[in-house]
């Protein structure tokens, strides 16, 4: 199976680095899927978007992201997010409460996290 190297990094931490068969991301130009040997490109991630990674040796990973960029070369996909959280790390009850927060950053992060949870439960 063909594979591509993927790195998902936020301002706060490195979330994942490894080999994947496909990566999908929501960009300002729409949702894109990146397979091995994809044409090089640079994309801007949407606010409150979702990134999915299908590792070659494991279960699909889903992250909620808050802005950033996606860089694609023939051999590597690098996702640099302002904020990112794995769907399994999201406390849905707390995130739902944060949607009503006056803190815009907390609200935005909650939206990104909840979108990741929804995408993860879709099983796509």
Swiss-Prot record:
Keyword Cell membrane: yes
Assigned GO CC terms: plasma membrane; proton-transporting ATP synthase complex
Annotated compartments: Cell membrane
Domain of life: Bacteria
Major location (coarse): membrane
Keyword set includes Signal: no
Disulfide bond entries: none
One Gene Ontology MF term: ATP binding
Sorted UniProt keywords: ATP synthesis, Cell membrane, CF(1), Hydrogen ion transport, Ion transport, Membrane, Transport
Membrane topology: Peripheral membrane protein
Family: Belongs to the ATPase epsilon chain family.
Annotated function: Produces ATP from ADP in the presence of a proton gradient across the membrane.
NCBIfam families referenced in this protein's UniProt entry, alphabetically: ATP_synt_epsi, PRK00571.2-5, PRK13442.1
Quaternary structure (record): F-type ATPases have 2 components, CF(1) - the catalytic core - and CF(0) - the membrane proton channel. CF(1) has five subunits: alpha(3), beta(3), gamma(1), delta(1), epsilon(1). CF(0) has three main subunits: a, b and c.
PANTHER family reported for this sequence: ATP SYNTHASE DELTA/EPSILON CHAIN (PTHR13822), ATP SYNTHASE EPSILON CHAIN, CHLOROPLASTIC (PTHR13822:SF10)
Name of the protein described by the UniProt record: ATP synthase epsilon chain
Organism the protein comes from: Corynebacterium efficiens (strain DSM 44549 / YS-314 / AJ 12310 / JCM 11189 / NBRC 100395)
């Amino acid at each position: 199976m063909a594979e591509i190297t993927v790195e998902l990094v936020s301002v706060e931490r490195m979330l994942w680095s490894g080999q994947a068969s496909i990566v999908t991301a929501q960009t300002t130009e729409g949702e894109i899927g990146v397979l091995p040997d994809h044409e090089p490109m640079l994309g801007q991630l949407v606010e409150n978007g979702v990134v999915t990674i299908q590792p070659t040796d494991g279960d699909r990973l889903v992250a909620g992201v808050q802005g950033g960029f996606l860089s694609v070369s023939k051999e590597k996909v690098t996702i640099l997010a302002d904020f990112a959280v794995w769907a399994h790390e999201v406390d849905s009850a707390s995130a739902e409460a944060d949607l009503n927060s006056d803190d815009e950053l907390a609200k935005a992060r909650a939206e990104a996290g909840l979108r990741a949870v929804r995408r993860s439960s879709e099983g796509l």
